[in-house]
């Protein structure tokens, strides 16, 4: 599956969320990651994040699709993160 993950966490938890997401996905912009994951990788990522974050304060939003070809992406402004083609 192709995943776009966005997180908003307290500053003290940002480094952990960043490190965890980078193990599984490409960093594309500040708190935004994308990439292809198997079902097992997705479950492992979400379990790890769930254990690291305060779910009464932090939030994660995940968009999933079968293929990156189904996602249309448009960039404006200064590119951040890893600009290698994921799509």
From Swiss-Prot:
One of its GO terms (biological process) is defense response to virus. Mg(2+) binds at residue 8. Signal peptide: none annotated. One of its GO terms (molecular function) is RNA endonuclease activity. CDD domains: Cas2_I_II_III (cd09725). The keyword Lyase does not apply. Belongs to the CRISPR-associated endoribonuclease Cas2 protein family. HAMAP family: Cas2. This is CRISPR-associated endoribonuclease Cas2. It comes from Frankia alni (strain DSM 45986 / CECT 9034 / ACN14a). The gene is cas2.
């Amino acid at each position: 599956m192709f995943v776009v993950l966005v997180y908003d966490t307290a500053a003290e938890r940002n480094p952990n969320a960043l490190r965890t997401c980078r193990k599984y996905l490409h960093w594309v912009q500040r708190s935004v990651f994308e990439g292809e994951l198997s079902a097992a990788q997705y479950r492992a990522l979400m379990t790890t994040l769930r254990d690291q974050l305060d779910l009464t304060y932090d939030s994660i939003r995940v968009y999933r699709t079968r293929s990156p070809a189904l996602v249309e992406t448009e960039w404006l402004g200064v590119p951040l993160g890893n600009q290698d083609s994921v799509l």
